[in-house]
Amino acid sequence: MRVLTIIPTYNEIESLPLTLGRLRDAVPESDVLVVDDASPDGTGDWADTRAAEDPSVHVLHRTTKDGLGGAYIAGFRWGLERGYDVLVEMDADGSHQPEQLPRLLEAVRTADLVIGSRRVPGGKMVNWPTSRKMISWAGSLYPRIMLGLNLTDITAGYRAYRADTLRAIDLDAIESKGYGFQVDMTFRTARLGKRIVEVPITFVERELGESKMSGGIVGEAVVNVTRWGLAARWEGLRARLGL
């Protein structure tokens, strides 16, 4: 099973060396693709140097910063073109524990999409205040209700996709740039009838660098989820009425 772990970066020079080192130690059989959006802090240059030393590390440079979704889609296309069997999403900031990747890879042997969940039994969040946990919970509950998805952590970004799952999705139709991208991909996977499994992970708040979350990203996600949910309900109503 050929595995590619995709790590999007923008100004992650403090975090990426630690995360990449841990990943190579924990799962040496996984190749790594760093997708850098022209980081002005030298992240891309550092990644190039590491790739020159390690043939399992690759770098994809993009000229503009156009969001998490665009970076992952570029990474998916790169990996699919090169015949990888499983494509993993992982944050550069250390929030996703590389040492827990084996449990995602084991689960994806019998699933189409595996989500590392903070909310299933055994999952947890570290260094998050209660207020942040409540906001995150609400952010996951809303799409769960609107889209009818029986999952605990729809917005989670630690994931493993089978290549066939990604090939079945029209990646050109993905609209979300920010964290709504995770909801978009989950919804499309579910509508294809694919098997989605959640496994527990420990999510640790970043200690280095700056978060990329913003009000605009949250707003985009809310608007899109509402639109998708209403459209799905309308489709269901038309089908029942024979329209």
Swiss-Prot record:
Known EC number: 2.4.1.54
Function: Catalyzes the transfer of mannose from GDP-mannose to D-mannosyl-1-phosphoundecaprenol.
Presence of the UniProt keyword Glycosyltransferase in the record: yes
GO MF assignments: all-trans-undecaprenyl-phosphate mannosyltransferase activity; dolichyl-phosphate beta-D-mannosyltransferase activity
Keywords tagged on the record: Glycosyltransferase, Transferase
Gene Ontology process terms (BP): glycolipid biosynthetic process
Catalytic activity: di-trans,octa-cis-undecaprenyl phosphate + GDP-alpha-D-mannose = D-mannosyl di-trans,octa-cis-undecaprenyl phosphate + GDP
Source organism (scientific name): Micrococcus luteus (strain ATCC 4698 / DSM 20030 / JCM 1464 / CCM 169 / CCUG 5858 / IAM 1056 / NBRC 3333 / NCIMB 9278 / NCTC 2665 / VKM Ac-2230) (Micrococcus lysodeikticus)
Disulphide-bonded residues: none
Gene3D superfamilies (alphabetical): Spore Coat Polysaccharide Biosynthesis Protein SpsA, Chain A
Keyword Flavoprotein: no
EC class of the enzyme, as a word: transferase
Any one Gene Ontology cellular component term annotated for this protein: membrane
Pfam families attached to this UniProt entry: Glycos_transf_2 (PF00535)
Name used for this protein in its record: Undecaprenyl-phosphate mannosyltransferase
Family: Belongs to the glycosyltransferase 2 family.
